[in-house]
Curated annotation (Swiss-Prot):
GO terms for cellular component: histone deacetylase complex; nucleoplasm; transcription regulator complex. It comes from the Eukaryota. There is a cross-link at residue 590 (Glycyl lysine isopeptide (Lys-Gly) (interchain with G-Cter in SUMO1)). The modification Asymmetric dimethylarginine is found at residue 193. The modification Phosphoserine is found at residues 461, 661, 709, 923. There is a cross-link at residues 166, 590 (Glycyl lysine isopeptide (Lys-Gly) (interchain with G-Cter in SUMO2)). Keywords: Acetylation, DNA-binding, Isopeptide bond, Methylation, Nucleus, Phosphoprotein, Transcription, Transcription regulation, Ubl conjugation. This is Mitotic deacetylase-associated SANT domain protein. The modification N-acetylmethionine is found at residue 1. The keyword Transcription applies. Residues 943-957 have a biased composition (Acidic residues). Residues 721-813 form the ELM2 domain. The keyword Ion transport does not apply.
Length: 1045
């Protein structure tokens, strides 16, 4: 059949149609003639089984099988390249669709792309019987031996004959021009009816009460003449290739002649039948034996000697299949069947390439049905012909040498596969494209490999890539196998099988998948979108060939069927033949090289919750059969049977089951209960880390779930859900009382601050408070000099008494008892930092920036929180050296030069009070040290700290006196004192800044001191004025970090 592609002038992509759409006539290319011939070829093969009896007149109407076999028809659309001759040859009979599902839109969209407008379709008189097209789907698919359909059956070789090919090429375009103008839309729609006879054949063949499934693969994928899909073996590219040479040649001589004659005959009477013939509603039982040919030139069938071939018993054959085969030989009336709507095709199903469930249900699920209607669903064991008839497949049977047939797969991109129709590959962008190449005999490799019923158009480039891969794979396969195919018969068979490189996984699914489908009762969907295709190695093919002659097919080793690439394209448009080869090549490159199968993503699902309903009645699901019944420890452990007559007995409170699974990983809710109630000496094991995986996903008896139940035999058990009713479960409601009594209740909160009445109105009191806060920021207080917050708290506790507040602040013992709510309260900035700690802090900040964890590791004597607090306390008073170094807090100022180089940066809220200019200016370091020391005292509140604080205070007092005595020499004195002192205490000079403002104020005096140090050598007065003016100016502005202005 290796026909060269007919180049078409118009490269317009064909629109795929669904439903009742009727395409414009110009978009309905006439189909090629090869499919019809292939149909007849297979028909003859099948008729060989039946015998010549009971020929049916061409005018007898035939009713199609139910929609179950129709689902595959709706995707069949001829590519634009198909010639009118093929379309004409397939105008077998006009038949009425019995079901609305098979009506116009769903009808075979083959030739015209549209459906048949009639609600039912019947064969028209004068037209060839529809069974001729159906036979291509029948037993030639399954029952033939590995290499041969049946020894006694001759197969017409019209499509393989060179002259016929030439005539086809010459006549195609002319017929196209001749036919198109006179074809109305309805006729063009009915051009697709050649597949209706296919359905009608099975409908007539099947016994009553059988629902025949669609011929799943070939119908939707189109007719491929020379391909055979053998369930039991790799299909040879030419059906006659495996025939015994003598009989093949003898029977094929008249076939070739008649087919050549028919090719030359004009095909136009078919359309006259469409126009004039009334449709006959009557339906008659038909025997699909040999019959005289109709106007389409099926007369060549009559010349074939079609001896009935008995089916030898095969142990591997399903009894239903054997019975079906026996029944096929007897004529049976075709009965209309209940319409079974087909489920919508899904992409996943299409990847798996399984039959539509309804199609399989037609044969498998209905009681009266047998395997005849279900041919595609069963793996047919090979029917062994008489041993004498078996011979090597004759390569020259069709007049083509084996090498020539193989070479026809390869040349100039016009042949996609031995079937010679590269157009099919464009039609099937997915694996069906490959399958169409490789599916073998039943000529119709489900023509619409990709769902052709979509209206959306895909880019030509996408299809070009896919189909190029497909053709490439076929060519590579044939080339590789041609080298091995010159030897023995097995090698030759392997060549024939591997030329279909993609294999016929659809025809030969693994045993596991077949059993799963049959057992589940769910009929697999066959979706001509993307079918997994397996690659066939020549060695496997040879082995399979050897097995097939013994009646054992490759099903014996299903594990070797490795699926190849699955192309999940759902939509495809026909592409001119020029692009087809490149696309097929690219696609087959994938198929050859990488058998990667795209796996759908599996979404993680939560572990199943397994909680028993009742003790003893819990039956673990079979999937989790190794999980033992579990009694929740939180549910009521009561056995009602133990207390049958006790009316006073009360059930314990019912605790609902846990939300989480008892076998989840971790200790869970039951660990404590197990430990507490366990009478076993050793505590039961906790649920292992991966318990939920091992327990819930394995069925091995080795995995033992943790023993969570520790209740003995005598433990009463009651886990019946119930509502806890009774006085035990009621809340105690106090008696109603007068609301006025609430005022007398002591408040449970601690009163921290409450301003007295005349504070806002009395200016004198406000001035006193301000003075107190100013003093709190000075070094006169041994403790708490760093923060105004402490002063305010003391003032509150003293009920506004300023003198009492000063006394509290001057005390060297803890301000509050240990049980006071503020006893452990930390006042910001009250930490005491030694000079060494400050140096380390500045060093750490310079190295690690604000990574206080590393800074704390460097200091080691302060916590991370204290480091953070120190940083933000002095952040706004950082001293920036001329080299850009930042200095936080007071460091060793013994180096006069470094002190002069520092520039003070004052915080905007800090204030220096003119009332106490000298202390602030002359002894800033002491003031800083003092506040910190004082703050540390209240925070620690320890008596042991008092001596240390006292020493510090004495030292600082001495320093202050000396500095005040000689103001001009204060800088030197300060430096000496600072170097001598180990502890520096932060001091805040801010009077109005609450909270951390005190700490910031303490920084300010420090900075003021630095300035004074720098300015004192010149004049004390100059430094005072500079400091005050700078402080007042910067009070409400952000200072410049470089110049301090």
């Amino acid at each position: 059949m290796n026909l060269q592609a007919q180049p078409k002038a118009q490269n317009k992509r064909k629109r795929c149609l669904f439903g009742g759409q009727e395409p414009a006539p110009k978009e309905q290319p006439p189909p090629l003639q090869p499919p019809q011939q292939s149909i007849r070829v297979k028909e003859e093969q099948y008729l060989g089984h039946e015998g010549p009896g009971g020929a049916v007149s061409t005018s007898q109407p035939v009713e199609l099988p139910p929609p179950s076999s129709l689902a595959l028809l709706n995707s069949v659309v001829y590519g634009p390249e198909r010639t009118s001759a093929a379309m004409l040859s397939q105008q077998v009979a006009s038949v009425k669709w019995p079901n609305s599902v098979m009506a116009p839109g769903r009808g075979p969209e083959r030739g015209g792309g549209g459906g048949v407008s009639d609600s039912s379709w019947q064969q028209q008189p004068g037209q060839p019987p529809p069974h001729s097209t159906w036979n291509c789907h029948s037993l030639s698919l399954y029952s033939a031996t590995k290499g041969s359909p049946h020894p006694g059956v001759g197969v017409p070789t019209y499509y393989n004959h060179p002259e016929a090919l030439k005539r086809e090429k010459a006549g195609g375009p002319q017929l196209d021009r001749y036919v198109r103008p006179m074809m109305p839309q309805k006729v063009q729609l009915e051009v697709g009816r050649p597949q209706a006879p296919l359905n009608s054949f099975h409908a007539a063949k099947k016994p009553p009460n059988q629902s025949l499934p669609l011929q799943p693969f070939q119908l939707a994928f189109g007719h491929q003449v020379n391909r055979q899909v053998f369930r039991q073996g790799p299909p040879p590219p030419n059906p006659v290739a495996a025939f015994p040479p003598q009989k093949q040649q003898q029977q094929q001589q008249p076939q070739q002649q008649q087919q050549q004659q028919q090719a030359a005959l004009p095909q136009m009477p078919l359309f006259e039948n469409f126009y004039s013939m009334p449709q006959q509603p009557s339906q008659q039982p038909q025997d699909f034996g040999l019959q005289p040919a109709g106007p389409l030139g099926q007369s060549h069938l009559a010349h074939h000697s079609m001896a009935p071939y008995p089916f030898p018993p095969n142990p591997d054959m399903n009894p239903e299949l054997r019975k079906a085969l026996l029944q096929d030989s007897a004529p049976q009336p075709a009965l209309p069947q209940v319409q079974i709507p087909f489920p919508r095709r899904s992409r996943r199903l299409s990847k798996e390439g399984i039959l539509p469930p309804s199609a399989l249900d037609g044969a498998g699920t209905q009681p009266g049905q047998e395997a005849t209607g279900n041919l595609f669903l069963h793996h047919w064991p090979l029917q062994q012909p008489p041993p004498g008839s078996l011979g090597q497949p004759h390569p020259e049977a069709l007049g083509f040498p084996l090498e020539l047939r193989e070479s026809q797969l390869l040349p100039d991109g016009e042949r996609l596969a031995p079937n010679g129709r590269e157009r099919e590959a464009p039609a099937m962008g997915s694996e069906e494209g490959m399958r169409a190449v490789s599916t073998g005999d039943c000529g119709q490799v489900l023509r619409g490999g990709v769902i052709q019923s979509t209206r959306r158009r895909r880019r030509a480039s996408q299809e070009a890539n896919l189909l190029t891969l497909a053709q490439k794979a076929v060519e590579l396969a044939s080339l590789q196998n041609a080298k091995d195919g010159s030897g023995s018969e097995e090698k030759r068979k392997s060549v024939l099988a591997s030329t279909t490189k993609c294999g016929v996984e659809f025809s030969e699914p693994s045993l596991a998948t077949k059993r799963a489908r049959e057992d589940s009762g769910m009929v697999p969907l066959i979706i001509p979108v993307s079918v997994p295709v397996r690659t066939v190695d020549p060695t496997e093919a040879a082995q399979a060939g050897g097995l097939d002659e013994d009646g054992k097919g490759p099903e014996q080793n299903p594990a070797e069927h490795k699926p190849s690439v699955i192309v999940t394209r759902r939509r495809s448009t026909r592409i001119p033949g020029t692009d087809a080869q490149a696309q097929a090549e690219d696609m087959n490159v994938k198929l050859e090289g990488e058998p990667s199968v795209r796996k759908p993503k599996q979404r993680p699902r939560p572990e199943p919750l397994i909680i028993p309903t009742k003790a003893g009645t819990f039956i673990a699901p079979p999937v989790y059969s190794n999980i033992t019944p579990y009694q929740s420890h939180l549910r009521s452990p009561v056995r009602l049977a133990d207390h049958p007559s006790e009316r006073s007995f009360e059930l314990p409170p019912y605790t609902p089951p846990p939300i989480l699974s008892p076998v989840r990983e971790g200790s869970g809710l039951y660990f404590n209960a197990i430990i507490s109630t366990s009478t076993i000496p050793a505590p039961p094991p906790i649920t292992p880390k991966s318990a939920h995986r091992t327990l819930l996903r394995t069925n091995s008896a080795e995995v033992t779930p943790p023993v969570l139940s520790v209740m003995g035999e005598a433990t009463p058990v009651s886990i019946e859900p119930r509502i806890n009713v009774g006085s035990r479960f009621q809340a105690e409601i106090p008696l109603m009382r007068d609301r006025a009594l609430a005022a007398a209740d002591p408040h449970k909160a601690d009163l921290v601050w409450q301003p007295w009445e005349d504070l806002e109105s009395s200016r004198e009191k406000q001035r006193q408070v301000e003075d107190l806060l100013t003093a709190a920021c000075s070094s006169i207080f041994p403790g708490a000099g760093t923060n105004q917050e402490l002063a305010l708290h003391c003032l509150h506790e003293s009920r506004g008494d300023i003198l009492e507040t000063l006394n509290k602040l001057l005390l060297k013992k803890p301000l509050r008892p240990h049980n006071h709510p503020l006893a452990t309260y930390h006042y910001t900035g009250s930490d005491q930092w030694k000079m060494a700690e400050r140096k380390l802090f500045n060093k750490g900040i310079a190295i690690y920036k604000k990574d206080f964890f590393l800074v704390q590791k460097l200091i080691q004597t302060k916590t991370v929180a204290q480091c953070v607090e120190f940083y933000y306390t002095y952040k706004k008073q950082v001293k920036i050296g001329r080299n850009g170094t930042l200095t936080f807090g007071d460091v060793d100022t013994s180096d006069e030069k470094s002190a002069q180089e520092e520039v003070e940066v004052d915080i905007k809220t800090s204030q220096k009070f003119p009332r106490v200019p000298l202390p602030r200016r002359e002894s800033p370091s002491e003031e800083r040290l003092e506040p910190k020391r004082e703050v540390k005292e209240p925070r620690k509140e320890g008596e042991e700290e008092v001596p240390e604080i006292q020493e510090k205070e004495e030292q600082e007092e001495g320093r202050e006196r000396s500095r005040r005595a000689a103001a001009v020499k204060a800088t030197q004195t300060l430096q000496a004192n600072e170097s001598a002192s180990d502890i520096l205490i932060l001091r805040s000079h801010e009077s109005n800044a609450p909270g951390s403002a005190g700490g910031q104020a303490s920084e300010k005096p420090r900075e003021g001191t630095g300035k004074s140090r720098r300015a004192l050598p010149f004049s004390e007065k100059k430094k005072k004025t500079e400091t005050f003016s700078k402080t007042q100016n910067q009070e409400n502005t952000f200072p410049c970090k470089k110049c301090g202005r």
